Amino acid sequence: MAEKTITVEEVLKHNTRDDLYIVVKDKVYDISKFLDAHPGGEEVLVDLAGRDASGPFEDVGHSEDAQELLEKFYIGNLLRTEDGPQLPTTGAAAGGSGYDSSQPVKPAMWLFVLVMVVAYFAFRKYVLK
């Protein structure tokens, strides 16, 4: 029997507490019935709804038992297309780094960098004579 394939569009539709899909390593899981049992709390999973959760799943360092449990919720393989919508990746709320390279650097960050550079050279000039 052939593996079921699930499109990105389909995954994106399942993003609520009652109907929740996540993707880990291009495998799609329906974890709707697991929310209450998740040791890390249901909010962690809700934040990952309809997204690629590969990064956060790996970052947590789930045990072999947790990985086997996840397989019980497997429903198919993700079908990605070049011209179709892309699956959102996770951010800080979902346990990722929160860094989004598509966002410009804020002026406050530039000011912080400038202050640090000036402090570095002042330290070298006046303290490390």
UniProtKB/Swiss-Prot annotation:
Which stretches are transmembrane?
105-125
The protein depicted here goes by the name Probable cytochrome b5 2
* One matching Pfam family: Cyt-b5
Question: What keywords is this UniProt entry annotated with?
Answer: Electron transport, Endoplasmic reticulum, Heme, Iron, Membrane, Metal-binding, Microsome, Mitochondrion, Transmembrane, Transmembrane helix, Transport
Q: What is the lineage of its organism?
A: Eukaryota, Fungi, Dikarya, Ascomycota, Taphrinomycotina
Function, as annotated: Membrane bound hemoprotein which function as an electron carrier for several membrane bound oxygenases.
Q: Where does this protein hold heme?
A: 38, 62
Question: What biological-process GO terms show up in the record?
Answer: ergosterol biosynthetic process
A GO CC term?
A: mitochondrion
**What gene makes this protein?**
oca8
Q: Which cysteines are joined by disulfide bonds?
A: none
